[in-house]
Amino acid sequence: MAHKKAGGSTRNGRDSHSKRLGVKCFGGECVSSGTIIVRQRGNTFHPGKYVGCGRDYTLFALKSGKVLFEKRGALRRKFISIVS
């Protein structure tokens, strides 16, 4: 006979891989065309001048220059632009 009672099973013990989201190039940093600036879920940051937006809301540089973070509009939305 067993001298220990059987242990119960658990429904925990899983976790998803991190998605490596966030700002990849910060304000004042020089970037070349096509460089990813931000990976995000939804529009936390909005594309400004010379910044494109991918279908997963990734922001990337459309031309070479320096990254500029700014707040614009009545809602004070965060925009990212490329300045030369």
From Swiss-Prot:
Write out the ranges of the annotated region (Disordered): 1-20
MF GO annotations = structural constituent of ribosome
Gene3D superfamilies, alphabetized: 2.40.50.100
InterPro entries assigned to the protein according to its UniProt record, in alphabetical order? Ribosomal_bL27 (IPR001684), Ribosomal_bL27_CS (IPR018261)
Pfam families, alphabetized: Ribosomal_L27
Q: Does the keyword DNA-binding apply?
A: no
**Which residue spans traverse the membrane?**
none
BP terms from Gene Ontology: translation
Keyword field contains Cell membrane: no
Which UniProt keywords are given for this protein, alphabetically ordered? Answer: Ribonucleoprotein, Ribosomal protein
Give GO cellular component annotations, separated by semicolons: cytosolic large ribosomal subunit
Tell me which family the UniProt entry assigns to this protein.
Belongs to the bacterial ribosomal protein bL27 family.
Protein name per UniProt: Large ribosomal subunit protein bL27
Native organism is Blochmanniella pennsylvanica (strain BPEN)
